[in-house]
Swiss-Prot record:
Position of sequence motif Involved in the stabilization of the negatively charged intermediate by the formation of the oxyanion hole: 110-112
SUPFAM superfamilies, A to Z: alpha/beta-Hydrolases (SSF53474)
Modes of activity regulation: Inhibited by diisopropylphosphofluoridate (DFP).
Catalytic activity: a triacylglycerol + H2O = a diacylglycerol + a fatty acid + H(+)
EC supergroup of this enzyme: hydrolase
Gene coding for it: AADAC
UniProt keyword list: Disulfide bond, Endoplasmic reticulum, Glycoprotein, Hydrolase, Lipid metabolism, Membrane, Microsome, Signal-anchor, Transmembrane, Transmembrane helix
Protein name per its UniProtKB record: Arylacetamide deacetylase
Organism: Oryctolagus cuniculus (Rabbit)
Amino acid sequence: GVKTVLLLIVGVLGAYYVYTPLPDNIEEPWRLLWVNAHMKTLTNLALFAEYLGSNIFMNTVKFLTSFQEVPPTSDENVTVTETTFNNVPVRVYVPKRKSKTLRRGLFYIHGGGWCVGSAALSGYDLLSRRTADRLDVVVVSTNYRLAPEYHFPIQFEDVYDALKWFLRQDVLEKYGVDPERVGVSGDSAGGNLAAAVAQQLIKDPDVKIKLKTQSLIYPALQTLDMDLPSYRENAQFPILSKSFMVRLWSEYFTSDRSLEKAMLLNQHVPVESSHLFKFTNWSSLLPEKFKKGHVYNTPTYGSSELARKYPGFLDVRAAPLLADDAQLRGFPLTYVITCQYDVLRDDGVMYVTRLRNAGVQVTHNHIEDGFHGALSYNGFKTGYRVEKQYFEWLRENV
């Protein structure tokens, strides 16, 4: 009687909460739905905490995520230590086997929307460990201060300071790294920071040792247009919805919600910055297969006041796609991973187009059945496939 009805109601509500329609080509769809339910629960708890006024949204997400952190434990193959590079906390992974030659170096930057995450998260620790062991590479996995306590450009500056420290001759010698074989890599917001610091490094006369490669894994690269085909198609897709991505972007610059509201409406860029739109105009930068009948809408200009208060969203250090062609020409060998079911897909695809137009050698790996964060979910077949291709590129190019 009543128990059956209650069970039925709970079952229906549970299915409604967990279930989201997914495309046919997604491998292991139920696994993705469970991960998404976990993410939904995290964000709903954070929204509830914010509603109660007990804590702000991002700090709650950060706190709940921190339970996935692991200590810096060495194993039979890799020595793991924590130290600081120029006052920035980093984890260093050094293979234990003897090497007759200098090793390659990889500087890794974690994702998490500039607001959450750390090198200590189990997924990042495992990735760094596997990279060091399988490729015989010294991996430096950096931390950086996070929003909402710290806004742009603090995240960029922390990462840049740590990278510059790693690229010092004496530091590379200490870790047995070949100065001609160092790459930078990052996923999501970490991919954003990797592209940004790689751009800055080219212009920096103080840095004598330059990067050999940059590898960007589903990176966030522009703040100008939140109405790209990938944002339209994947607005409600699991892991990273459009509204959550906009929240992360806006939080990078300020906790003032008026920027978030303007970005959601795609009405945040002032008319005096209209010249920047040519760098993110998807109608000319996306290959046909990514346009799929979408019509380009000329952006509606926003308030000059917002841009005056929070100029970061128009800064090339926050949005690497805003670099002009001359800046892009000096780039190292580049690898870009994009995923079909990801709001950030078109950021990466447009960057590939612009780098190639500037004469940079780029390998673009587009995952037709991929979704945002695939590499971080170690149990997924898609994640293993992405990792395998990423490792192959690093092995051949760093």
